[in-house]
């Protein structure tokens, strides 16, 4: 798609992100392939857990186990939307399975994501700057509804100087909050959030599995070399098989490959 047409296409989503702190981009993964992508993700979580048990959770990046899913992470509509907020050069800071079984019970756990998560020792201190420093995406690989537990969000809280995990803010992160709603979408849709927005995983009271992957995008300049599983690497031969656009997003995690961008 030509640049002008692409920017015109994503403008409503960018505007909603700026004003509300979230949006849902539909059909990022096409309907004719989303089932096989979901199957890969569900199967590969077992493989990832077995590998991590044997070798350690920091040894292998999650994306190494799901190449079909990875192929969609540089979707042009998605990246164009994200780049309008983070700038033209972005990379992926975290990839995480988010699969919930049937009849899964869970209380609210409202928070903001890296680098604003006040429970992480490497968070930005309050008050948060009035700038977008992280984008969280939730890839809905099965349909997300109010019946199976669409993600809880509180619109417009991305510009609130308080936080549910702020010790002096008196909000609390375990309770329902005024204005909360559930983000819903069909399989193949992506929930895009300003990482500052207050949000929470949800229970799954339905009889079916709810499958998603969380992928966080960061501006090129943000320090991602922090202790933990998010610094796990991708084997060079696996990295070589990724589409070029996706390589740009994960180059900083490739083993034994000379960087071409993130030097």
List PLM regions with ranges.
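Non-heme Fe(II)/2-oxoglutarate
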Residues: 2-3, 190, 197-198, 202-263
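A short secondary-structure junction signal
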Residues: 105-112, 119-122, 147-153, 162-166, ...
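A structural signal for short, well-ordered beta-strand segments
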Residues: 95-97, 137-139, 213-217
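Short, surface-exposed loop/helix-turn segments at secondary-structure junctions
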Residues: 111-122, 166-179, 209, 228-233
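Double-stranded beta-helix
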Residues: 131-134, 143-202
């Amino acid at each position: 798609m030509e640049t002008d047409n692409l920017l015109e296409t994503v403008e409503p989503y960018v505007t909603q992100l700026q004003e509300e702190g979230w949006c849902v981009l539909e059909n990022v993964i096409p309907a004719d392939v989303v089932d096989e992508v979901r199957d890969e993700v569900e199967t590969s979580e077992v493989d990832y857990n077995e590998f991590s048990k044997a070798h350690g959770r920091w040894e292998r990046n999650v994306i190494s186990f799901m190449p079909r899913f990875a192929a969609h992470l540089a979707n042009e509509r998605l990246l164009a939307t994200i780049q309008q907020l983070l700038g033209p050069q972005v990379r992926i800071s975290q990839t995480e399975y988010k699969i919930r079984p049937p009849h899964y019970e869970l209380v609210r756990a409202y928070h903001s994501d890296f680098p604003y998560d006040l429970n992480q020792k490497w968070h930005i201190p309050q008050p948060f700057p009035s700038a977008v420093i992280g984008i969280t995406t939730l890839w809905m690989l099965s349909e997300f509804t109010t019946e199976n537990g669409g993600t809880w969000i509180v619109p417009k809280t991305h510009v609130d100087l308080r936080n549910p995990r702020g010790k002096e803010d008196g909000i609390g992160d375990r309770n329902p909050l005024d204005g909360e709603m559930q983000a819903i979408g069909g399989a193949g849709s992506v929930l895009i959030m300003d990482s500052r927005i207050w949000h929470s995983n949800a229970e799954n009271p339905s009889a079916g599995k709810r499958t998603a992957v969380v992928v966080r995008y960061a501006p090129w300049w943000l320090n991602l070399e922090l202790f933990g599983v998010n610094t796990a690497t991708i084997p060079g031969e696996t990295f070589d098989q990724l589409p070029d656009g996706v390589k740009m997003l994960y180059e900083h995690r490739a083993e034994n490959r000379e960087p071409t961008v993130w030097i």
